[in-house]
């Protein structure tokens, strides 16, 4: 009787799995024809028929749900499609943990759905286990950049650079990031303004100069100088590691230019920044000195004519 029961149970499970696979194949047909809602319905029936789960069903269900997502949408239908995909990829990871696609598609779906809070919590959890987890740090930089969390993206970029002090590009990246921010926040239209008095005009008769205005949200004054100095600090680090780093020299010039815009009401300080910017621009554009190949034949010494 016990043997018969085991056989019946095994046979029943086998039939359930066969039925599930039949519905999965039907779902695949709908998927290929572009009817993604119908495909999802068939995959859900397959799940009901075989509750133990088939990883391929969850994979295809998740992909079908992703096809119903609309970039940038916040509608209820979008949220249902996102949740459907995430749940399917979560089950796939549980059923087939050695298959990297489950985890990769789960993360990609979070990115595509702008679920940045979930991603941030996930990577910060990784950092609690290992504060120097470079993969988690790089992921946080990516997430915060996508979410336009500039301060957080900068914080983690600085963390990466501090953990890799001998990586010139890590230092350079922080400097470039800061330059871009300065340019976007009030630095695009100030280059033509010179706050110094015109030496050809009598100071008593010279009209008052009006600097180009900043707008709400721009970096200005002491805050602009502070941020520029931070970028200069990291660009200096890049040049300490790689003294011939021409791109870093070029951005050093640009950073000093942006710093000068914090001194539009202080001509002397403005002039120091502009002159320093020109010095760095000159270094960046200097021709590379020609070097003789190490294995080049040496010229024979001249002989005195006899």
Where do the model's predicted regions map?
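Bacterial signal peptide processing site
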Residues: 14-19
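Short coil/linker segments at helix-helix boundaries
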Residues: 20, 37, 66-91, 177-237, ...
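Canonical tetratricopeptide repeat
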Residues: 59-61, 105-106, 139, 173, ...
């Amino acid at each position: 009787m016990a043997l018969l029961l085991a056989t019946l149970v095994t046979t029943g499970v086998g039939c359930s799995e066969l039925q599930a696979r039949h519905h999965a194949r039907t779902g695949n047909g709908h998927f290929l024809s572009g009817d993604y809602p119908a495909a999802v319905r068939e995959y859900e029936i397959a799940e009901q028929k075989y509750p133990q789960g088939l990883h391929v069903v969850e994979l295809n269900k998740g992909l079908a749900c992703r096809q119903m997502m609309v970039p940038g949408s916040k509608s209820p239908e979008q949220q249902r499609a996102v949740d459907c995909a995430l749940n399917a990829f979560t089950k796939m990871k549980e059923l087939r943990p050695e298959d990297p696609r489950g985890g990769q598609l789960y993360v990609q779906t979070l990115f595509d759905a702008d679920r940045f809070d979930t991603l941030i919590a996930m990577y910060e959890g990784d950092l609690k286990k290992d504060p120097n987890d470079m993969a988690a740090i790089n992921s946080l930089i990516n997430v915060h950049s996508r979410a336009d969390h500039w301060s957080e993206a900068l914080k983690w970029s600085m963390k990466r650079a501090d953990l890799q002090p001998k990586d010139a590009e890590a230092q350079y990246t922080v400097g470039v990031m800061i330059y871009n921010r300065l340019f976007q926040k009030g630095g695009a239209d100030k280059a033509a303004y010179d706050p110094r008095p015109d030496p050809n005009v009598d100071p008593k008769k010279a009209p008052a100069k009006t600097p180009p205005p900043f707008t709400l949200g721009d970096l200005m004054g002491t805050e602009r100088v502070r941020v520029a100095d931070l970028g200069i600090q990291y660009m200096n680090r890049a040049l300490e590691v790689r003294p011939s780093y021409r791109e870093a020299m070029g951005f050093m010039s640009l950073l000093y230019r942006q710093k000068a815009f914090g001194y539009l009401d202080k001509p002397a300080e403005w002039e120091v920044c502009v002159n320093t910017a020109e010095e760095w621009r000159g270094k960046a554009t200097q021709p590379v000195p020609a070097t003789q190949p190490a294995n080049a034949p040496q010229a024979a010494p001249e002989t005195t004519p006899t």
